[in-house]
């Protein structure tokens, strides 16, 4: 049908015999638009309880200099938002200097100089792997993940971001964010991890709750030979620490069911952490029925600065949305050491949940490296082993060939994604390629299948 027909023919008449569409018929767990360098993963469509990650680089029109930027959804809101476009839209100085630049996004800025042309931009990320497959119409999975790569042009830095959603219950779940960054030719000065969250209060402490003794600082500024966007940050406080840290961002809700985003981050040598305020989140100010006056509230901002490279000392974070009436399920997050016979960027995470489940995660920058942490051995970009007293188990092999625990071993001759779950006395699996599962003295040769099916 030609577009001109809407104006030259008779008025358009809607056939009321055609039933209204259901949005669930058009949504998949993973959505990828390479023409816009935009990747979305979700674990459901419940407005209050589902989680969603939106990642984007810069491909096409109306794009920003943001590297691998991400937004997180939780408890009905875009809790971790991009900044927007400023008070005077695309023509304003605040857009040119801040809103279109790295520090206004949830990303990593290298040496304080990362930037490139905005509006019409041609700086896409490369999708290395994801599960479920983009556009695949399957049930929402208990674990999803993605891995993307980006070459930051100004600093000539390689950046890799691995993100995951882990569903732990009908109303609970958490995000995993592993961001690796290093300059191609070395000479790294620092890598700055920016994270912005909705809310009015922010509490940054060591992971055990002890004070970091944050002190006022002017370190994040244009005077540090950084892009001018840094000077838009204010009320800055910092501490140099190698400790694991925890940050709570809180929205004070009118009904007093306050919403929080809880963030745990792995510590590292030569690291500083900052609490700060950024200009208001203009992008949220146009959304009706927000819980507070967005234009009147500066944006809560966390920055982690890694001196030197941040590839073998990556930024590793776990995020969990919660509220007063729906508290989080995580009691603690630790980051155990990972053993490997090959040098590389190997990450271990242990998430202890209040109801007894323990999730163990290993991630590597090379899926061919054999990595071991505790009783878990993997060859994979990302692997998870969740166990609740043996009667509620989950095993996920992401972009790898081996996941081995004391009672279960998953292996494949080719790099694959495998989901194996045990619940209510039934084993189910899904796999993107042929694989083997060994457990209880038996060996199962499994064929590929996208939906969870009985073993």
Predicted features, each with a name:
Residues 50-57, 79-84, 120-121, 160-163, ...:
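Short amphipathic beta-strand/extended segments with alternating polar/hydrophobic composition
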Residues 193-195, 261-266, 275-290, 313-324:
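Short, hydrophobic/aromatic-enriched beta-strand segments in well-ordered soluble domains
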Residues 94, 205-218, 281-295, 447-455:
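Solvent-exposed beta-strand/loop surfaces of large extracellular or lumenal domains
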Residues 302-313, 319-455:
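Non-catalytic terminal regions with compositionally biased, polar/charged low complexity
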Residues 1-25, 29, 257-285:
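Acidic, glycine-rich loop-and-strand cores that form catalytic or ligand-binding grooves
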Residues 146-149, 247-249, 344-353:
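Short, hydrophobic/proline-enriched secondary-structure or compact coil segments at domain edges
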Residues 194-271:
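Polysaccharide-binding surfaces and accessory modules of carbohydrate-active proteins
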Residues 2-218, 309-311, 317-325, 334-341:
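Catalytic and substrate-binding regions of extracellular carbohydrate-active enzymes
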């Amino acid at each position: 049908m030609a577009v001109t027909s809407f104006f030259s023919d008779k008025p358009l008449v809607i056939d009321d015999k055609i039933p209204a569409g259901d949005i669930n018929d058009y949504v998949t767990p993973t959505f990828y638009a390479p023409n816009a360098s935009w990747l979305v993963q979700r674990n459901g469509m419940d407005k209050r309880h589902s989680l969603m990650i939106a990642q984007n680089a810069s491909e096409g029109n109306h794009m920003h200099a943001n590297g691998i930027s991400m937004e997180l959804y939780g408890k009905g809101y875009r809790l971790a938002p991009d900044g927007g476009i400023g008070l005077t839209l695309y023509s304003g100085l605040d857009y040119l200097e801040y809103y279109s630049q790295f520090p206004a996004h949830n990303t990593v800025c290298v040496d304080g100089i990362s930037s490139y042309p905005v509006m019409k931009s041609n700086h896409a990320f490369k999708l290395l792997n994801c599960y479920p497959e983009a556009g695949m119409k399957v049930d929402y999975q208990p674990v999803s993940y993605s891995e993307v790569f980006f070459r930051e042009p100004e600093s000539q830095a390689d950046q890799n971001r691995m993100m995951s959603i882990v569903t732990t219950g009908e109303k609970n779940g958490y995000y995993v964010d592993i961001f690796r960054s290093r300059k191609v030719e070395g000479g790294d000065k620092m890598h700055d991890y920016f994270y912005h969250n909705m809310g009015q209060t922010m509490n940054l402490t060591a992971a055990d709750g002890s004070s970091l003794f944050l002190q006022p600082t002017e370190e994040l500024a244009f005077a540090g030979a950084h892009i001018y966007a840094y000077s838009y940050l204010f009320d800055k406080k910092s501490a140099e620490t190698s400790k694991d840290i925890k940050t709570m961002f809180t929205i004070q809700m009118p009904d007093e069911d306050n919403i929080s985003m809880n963030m745990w981050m792995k510590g590292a040598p030569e690291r500083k952490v900052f609490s700060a305020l950024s200009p208001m989140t203009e992008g949220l100010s146009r959304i009706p029925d927000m819980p507070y006056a967005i234009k009147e509230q500066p944006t809560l901002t966390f920055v982690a600065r890694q001196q030197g490279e941040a590839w073998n000392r990556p930024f590793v974070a776990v995020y969990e949305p919660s509220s007063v009436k729906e508290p989080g399920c995580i009691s603690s997050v630790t980051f155990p050491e990972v053993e490997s016979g090959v040098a590389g960027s190997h990450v271990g995470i242990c998430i202890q949940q209040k109801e007894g489940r323990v999730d163990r995660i290993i991630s590597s920058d090379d899926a061919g490296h054999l990595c071991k942490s505790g009783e878990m051995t993997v060859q994979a970009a990302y692997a998870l082993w969740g166990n609740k007293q043996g009667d509620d188990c989950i095993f996920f092999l992401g972009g790898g060939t081996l996941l081995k625990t004391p009672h279960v071993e998953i292996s494949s001759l080719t790099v694959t994604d495998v989901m194996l779950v045990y619940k209510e006395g039934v084993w189910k699996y899904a796999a993107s390629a042929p694989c083997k599962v060994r457990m209880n003295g038996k060996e199962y040769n499994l064929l590929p299948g996208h939906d969870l099916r009985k073993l």
